[in-house]
Amino acid sequence: MTRWPFNLLLLLSVAVRDCSNHRTVLTVGYLTALTGDLKTRQGLAISGALTMALDEVNKDPNLLPNVYLDLRWNDTKGDTVLATKAITEMICDGIATIFGPEGPCYVEAIVSQSRNIPMISYKCAEYRASAIPTFARTEPPDTQVVKSLLALLRYYAWNKFSILYEDVWSPVADLLKDQATKRNMTINHKQSFIDNRVKCCEQMLDCCRSGYWYQLVQNTMNRTRIYVFLGAANSLVDFMSSMETAGLFARGEYMVIFVDMMVYSEREAEKYLRRVDQITFMSNCHSTENFNQMARSLLVVASTPPTKDYIQFTKQVQKYSSKPPFNLEIPRLFVESNFSKFISIYAAYLYDSVKLYAWAVDKMLREETRVLTDDVIFEVASNGTRVIDTIIKNRTYMSITGSKIKIDQYGDSEGNFSVLAYKPHKWNNSNNMPCNYHMVPVAYFHQGEEHPEYKLINGSIDWPSGGEKPADEPMCGFANELCKKDDTHYTSTVAAVVLGVLLFCSGVITMSIYRKWKIELEIEGLLWKIDPNEIKGYSGNEIVSSPSKVSLMSAQSYGSRWTNQFVTSTGRLRGAVVRIKELKFPRKRDISREIMKEMRLLRELRHDNINSFIGASVEPTRILLVTDYCAKGSLYDIIENEDIKLDDLFIASLIHDLIKGMIYIHNSQLVYHGNLKSSNCVVTSRWMLQVTDFGLHELRQCAENESIGEHQHYRNQLWRAPELLRNHIHGSQKGDVYAFAIIMYEIFSRKGPFGQINFEPKEIVDYVKKLPLKGEDPFRPEVESIIEAESCPDYVLACIRDCWAEDPEERPEFSVIRNRLKKMRGGKTKNIMDQMMEMMEKYANNLEDIVTERTRLLCEEKMKTEDLLHRMLPQSVAEKLTMGQGVEPVSYDLVTIYFSDIVGFTAMSAESTPLQVVNFLNDLYTVFDRIIRGYDVYKVETIGDAYMVVSGLPIKNGDRHAGEIASMALELLHAVKQHRIAHRPNETLKLRIGMHTGPVVAGVVGLTMPRYCLFGDTVNTASRMESNGEALKIHISNKCKLALDKLGGGYITEKRGLVNMKGKGDVVTWWLTGANENAIQKKLVDMMDMPPPLFSRPRKSPKLNPDSRQPSIQAMHFCGTGSRRQSTVPRAMDGESTYSLQGSVRESPRMVSKRDRDRERPPINGLGAGHFVGGALLESAQASLSTLNHSETNETNCDMDGGSGGVSGSGSGLVRQPNALHKPLAMVRPHRIISAAQLPQLGDNDDDSADTLLRESRSLDPMPMQQLRKRHDRVKLPPSKLSKNNSRSLDTGVSLISGNPNGEVHSSQLDLDNEMTANPVDATDGYDDELGLLMRHDNGQLPALRYSGSFPNAQISIVPTGRSAGGGGGGREGGGSNCAKHLNNNCNGGVNVEDDLESPLLQRQASLSVPPEEMLAHNKRWHSLEHMDGPGGHGGNSVSYAADIDNRHPGDLDFFSGSSNQHHRSKAAGGSKLTNWMTNIFKGNGVRSGEARRVGILPSGVHGARTGFTDMAASAAARDRESIV
């Protein structure tokens, strides 16, 4: 018990010792790049410097004694995203600081700043990070070298220099320029360059050229002496080589300063003088003759190399790198070599960053006044702003490299740089070649308080000149602007100027003398004078002339004296045709100097509308004036030639040519024409008018007075102005305007200069010369004739009158005239010939379009021909035949052949007409052909009732051939059971089928009509299997049965037993009775890919809309006309025949005579409360088995407009109910018709959203959306317009597609008139679908819509239908109660008001009770050569079928209407039946009668309605089955 104080004291001492040994653990983060795409990554080499620094800090008792620095590191691969992710995770895990990252650091620095975590980077030169307060770095950024550069430039007084830099150095270049400018230094050039030659050549830049550097030197050498080069070492070598080539180093005047941020290495210093790829192949230390001179012109600013102790540091780094946590093993190759090569300066930067951080935290903890708990220590150590401020305030730190490094105000290390120069230094280069000179450090920069100080090491630099350093500019400046000119130079300059002035004056005098001499030569005729011997084809005695023609009126007015006109001739001068005008004189005529000058002036005049003066041939008594020849003669000749029609364009072009020519003359030295008249306006072969016979007035007047008589003299004066006639002067500009007015009058009147004035020329001249009295109009040509002829516009006539005004000053200038007559050309600036050429070019282009169109049509016809051939023969066979190649027979090991015939066909053929037999086989084989499309089979031929199909050729299909034939046969047998014979509906078609499997040989037989035939016993055996079979059964051979068994048991067979066959004896055969899910299934056939019927191809017709992309659906809202590429034959399902498709055939109603119409039309008592139920065409009777079992309906969710409704009739009109569906059918793809079994369900459906059921048409082209956008609002039927006494035909709607302006219908057009009925419509342009309109009428009227098929000129009419029930007679109630409400109760004639709403009015094929020659209706096809309508029936009202096929709610009564269809009436079906039959074959309807489809189906008990088809009396037999009319 007495020892417990001692034990307590011992425990306390132990606790105190443990507390004194406790150290807070701070985790530091390290981001490096060990792997990745960073080319300069250093993580593998320098990471050991971090662990070395951390180990030294943790072991140093004087540095962070209570703190233990732990390490966490990440390999960021130099990627910013990975580095950011690592920093985020480290911060969340509570690190105190981050060393790194390696590579980009700006984003990472911002992230650390956001959490105030200090970041010290050892390898990041991104200058943007300097502004972040929590960021510092031990690697000096590139911009830090600027301070050292400026210290070097200031030291040597290089205040003018040029900067050449690569793009990555642009921040350094910008900072250098900015700092140099602040220090009053001059930047001569600042120019960037591109070092990447591959990039230069890919982008076709200037740097791709071999002379790029030489050009750069040439552009800068004359304005600089000092270059600061910022770029790669290879670029430096190329640049200095170009300077050496330019001879810039010969005199030692140029200096290049290169900047290298890497630490100087003696072994790598060769890169400053030679390209890296040239060092290996060095043969000596001096690669060129002037190499030493060039090398001395280079100074390099590089990072100061470390001390010798640095080598020991690198070895320690290597050891630590191989230890945990990095465990980086050094390759043996590196171990054997000098490892110092692989430990870069960045290891020292990394080491310094750790030591700098530890020092700063230690200082902060020593200054901390709080108790140093773990939380306090972590808070101090992770305070980024405070840590970085502590580092910055210290200003300097001692680096492991042995240098004292300064830190600037942003926390960036300013680095330690040295200057390298070419000095004597013995060393061995990379090829172990001894060299005496090398780039070695010659100076360093001492870090001062503000700026580094430049200090030399051991002497001076060897300058290239051998003595003084190069100056930054020449002594007298780059442009000698600093040197004063001495007297000698000044005297020489003055002498040179005086001599130059004297030479210039002498030259001017000489040129003046020469020009005067040349003018004299021109005047004397050396240029304009023509030797008479040069003119060929002309003589004074044999003049080939083209005398001007005189009009008949002129000849009558002036007599024969008008024919003595002055004429011109043609000749040839130097091979060219020229126009020659002869001036004759009675005696020798001397050419004065003034005339010679004028001839020279005439020769210099050149303009498109001036007839060029070539020269003159001077003889003693005559002068020949030679000008250009104009093939069309003079304007006077054209005006007097009545065969030439002058239209407005022609006249405008001639007048404007004349105006342009006169403007040129008036602006020339000639000043005026003086002799302007229509005979002096000539026209070239291009119908361009040119003015001629201007100038030389003295010669012309003298020659004229001597050579012509008085009459001709005065006639030539008819174009002269009054003032010229009175004063006898040669001419003036205003006189030319007067002559222009006379010429304009000539052109428009074409009756001479003064029209029909019956005066002699002398009298006319006297009247013109006479001054008019006051208020009297001057004597001018009469203009009443051109006013009456309306050949001259008013503004032209006003211009003429202004131009021949008596007062010359009132006459306009030609420039004003041109503006006033601009309207004549209609804005066109080209002349006649240019416009004609433009028209010809358009015509040629049009011809090219026509040729292209014809070529396209030819290609289409070729495609049709190839299509026909491919239908007759297999595609591979047809292609060989098309290419002219022979088709060799091919043997097939196993195929399966199908044969079938019709039992009792011979008897049926004997009892039927040929046309009925043909139609029957066509319907049957149409079903067959549609079914076999879904199987891999080939139809060989059909002969009569025989149908032959094969599988396994011409393309082999392995063992599937038997299954393909078997599945096809089962479906054909099922379809036959559903099929009904059109002319014998009570009889069942008995098909007998046989199948056999075996080898065959297939080949083409024949040349004229080649056929693809099969040969071999297999064909005969298959035929025997069919002939020995039974009706409605499939008889197969034993081989076929075995082939089917190989397919997995998908087919059900029944053994028949032994059957004796001709040529085979007793053979075992089988019945094929069915198939299960393992059988070969029918492949889906895309309806879009199915080819159209061969003989229903569209024919070109101008009636068709050229838009071939529009759907061919009749009477559809918002739809266009039928497509030329689309067939109007409705597309059926596999089980449907032509017989079962009659419900979609468009029919044409008959014309009803007015007498019958008046007799049969019942009174209108109002429309009652009936309403439209559906807009869908329903398939025939409920009992019809030809409708598909798998029909689909189109269920659409349409937008509702209001409540529920449709269109109902009440009182005297139709009332549009709300909730009408407005979704256009173009938005919904049509679907199949529902089966007859579904019809009662539709009839009982009272839902307003009843589905619209449509038969799918062959044309599935979508409606163009632009037409949907441009459609007009639908026109509704106003209830007020169906008055009691109104039933006239209704034109409603808007012609949306045709754009017919008459298509717009107003409310006043929507009346019905009892005195009118429906117009006949053209059904030959019908579309693929027609939907019946189901109606109910409570007052005995059945309004029906009729829509013409000739869209867009369509007409929709509402006509009163129905007559008294019961035998076609009396009251409308009679027999009404006997009419059933559904299709299986058929009746003919009228429709009673009590009839059920859901009883549809449908179309069907003619029954046996009506002979085919009486069934006159159009088969729905494309436009044909002849439209035929059936003859009228037995009287009664015509009924048209509903056209409301839009996908909308029943009762939504919207109509289309175009212009009246009176011009589209069908031609009557006249002529013999043979003619009609041949016409339908041409139409593509096959051999069926073109009259076989004008049919209709009415519910039983419905009488009196004129359907537009041949009427048929109701019979008991007809009432028991589907009534076929």
From Swiss-Prot:
Binding site for Mg(2+) 2: 901-902, 945
Record's bilayer topology term: Single-pass type I membrane protein
Tissue: In the adult, widely distributed in the head and thorax with highest levels in the optic lobe and central brain and expression also detected in the retina. Expressed at similar levels in adult head and body. In females, highly expressed in oocytes with lower levels in the digestive tract. In mid-embryogenesis, enriched in the circular visceral mesoderm that overlies the migrating salivary gland and in the fat body that underlies the gland but at background levels in the gland itself.
Biased composition (Polar residues): 1282-1308
Protein EC: 4.6.1.2
InterPro entries associated with the record: A/G_cyclase (IPR001054), A/G_cyclase_CS (IPR018297), ANF_lig-bd_rcpt (IPR001828), Cyclic_nucleotide_synthase (IPR050401), Kinase-like_dom_sf (IPR011009), Nucleotide_cyclase (IPR029787), Peripla_BP_I (IPR028082), Prot_kinase_dom (IPR000719)
Compositional bias segments (type: Basic and acidic residues): 1147-1162
Matching Pfam families: ANF_receptor, Guanylate_cyc, PK_Tyr_Ser-Thr
Principal location listed in the UniProt entry: membrane
Swiss-Prot/TrEMBL GO biological process terms: axon guidance; axon midline choice point recognition; cGMP biosynthetic process; defense response to Gram-positive bacterium; extracellular matrix organization; intracellular signal transduction; larval somatic muscle development; motor neuron axon guidance
Residues of the Protein kinase domain: 547-824
Transmembrane segments: 494-514
SUPFAM superfamilies from the UniProt entry: Nucleotide cyclase, Periplasmic binding protein-like I, Protein kinase-like (PK-like)
Domain Guanylate cyclase: 896-1026
Subcellular location: Cell membrane
Catalytic function, reaction form: GTP = 3',5'-cyclic GMP + diphosphate
Entry GO MF terms: ATP binding; GTP binding; guanylate cyclase activity; metal ion binding; peptide receptor activity; semaphorin receptor binding; signaling receptor activity
Disulfide bond residue pairs: none
UniProt keyword annotation of Transport present: no
UniProt note: domains: The guanylate cyclase domain is required for Sema-1a-mediated axon repulsion. The protein kinase domain is predicted to be catalytically inactive.
Protein name: Receptor-type guanylate cyclase Gyc76C
Organism: Drosophila melanogaster (Fruit fly)
